[in-house]
Amino acid sequence: MSRIDGRTPEQLRPVTIERGWSKHAEGSVLISFGDTKVFCTASVTEGVPRWRKGSGEGWVTAEYSMLPRSTNTRGDREAVRGKIGGRTHEISRLIGRSLRAVIDCKALGENTIVLDCDVLQADGGTRTAAITGAYVALADAVAWAQGKKIVKAGRKPLTDTVAAISVGIVDGTPLLDLCYEEDVRAETDMNVVCTGDGRFVEVQGTAEGAPFDRKELGALLDLATAGCVDLAALQRDALVRTQDA
């Protein structure tokens, strides 16, 4: 099958991870999955939510949003509408769950890290790009907190990497990392979150046009796990590069 951008079915879009985009945030990343661009910041706060106090454990949470003109037509800011949409809540929770899957909250101590993921430009896969970029921002924030002695030395707060990718069936063919034009045509659409050692954190799959069978599900999961392996390697490469390189 010939894809819109010339990729093979199992090929990621060009992925770039640029650290240190904000001089204020303890961790910050601009991540690009092709034309999808998401700005992720990680902010460290000493203390935890009231319901977490006295537990000795930290907390990691996330917020997701899209800039008004991140898509083909402008959308009002949700703050102007006076209500956060269901999709925004869902994706924010997904990002938070994904990151907490690889955090040892006990090692974090009673500290909170908030990830803000803002979509600058959308061309499919914004939530998967957000998760992948947010992990790198989180890693930088954890390193900053350890350097400042806010997080105690000893146990490692990060237990693994985590990344996410979209897969889908378009015109009967399983594809990795769908752009927007592929996403809207997909008979099946799925988002998969994996840890660096290949375990699944979340699998969100929907038959948009036609039901999918067990064989197709297996093919999609195989594509997704291979894609997440590649993304984990890119995350590791980004984290070993100096920010001014």
From Swiss-Prot:
Keyword Lipoprotein set for record: no
Nucleotidyltransferase keyword on record: yes
Protein family (similarity comment): Belongs to the RNase PH family.
GO biological process terms held by the UniProt record: rRNA catabolic process; rRNA processing; tRNA processing
This protein's UniProt keywords: Nucleotidyltransferase, RNA-binding, rRNA processing, Transferase, tRNA processing, tRNA-binding
Gene Ontology terms for molecular function: 3'-5'-RNA exonuclease activity; tRNA binding; tRNA nucleotidyltransferase activity
Pfam families: RNase_PH (PF01138), RNase_PH_C (PF03725)
Gene it is expressed from: rph
Organism of this sequence: Streptomyces griseus subsp. griseus (strain JCM 4626 / CBS 651.72 / NBRC 13350 / KCC S-0626 / ISP 5235)
Assembly: Homohexameric ring arranged as a trimer of dimers.
Family annotation (InterPro entries): ExoRNase_PH_dom1, ExoRNase_PH_dom2, ExoRNase_PH_dom2_sf, PNPase/RNase_PH_dom_sf, Ribosomal_Su5_D2-typ_SF, RNase_PH, RNase_PH_bac-type, RNase_PH_CS
This protein's name: Ribonuclease PH
Residues annotated to bind phosphate: R87, G125, T126, R127
Lineage: Bacteria, Bacillati, Actinomycetota, Actinomycetes, Kitasatosporales
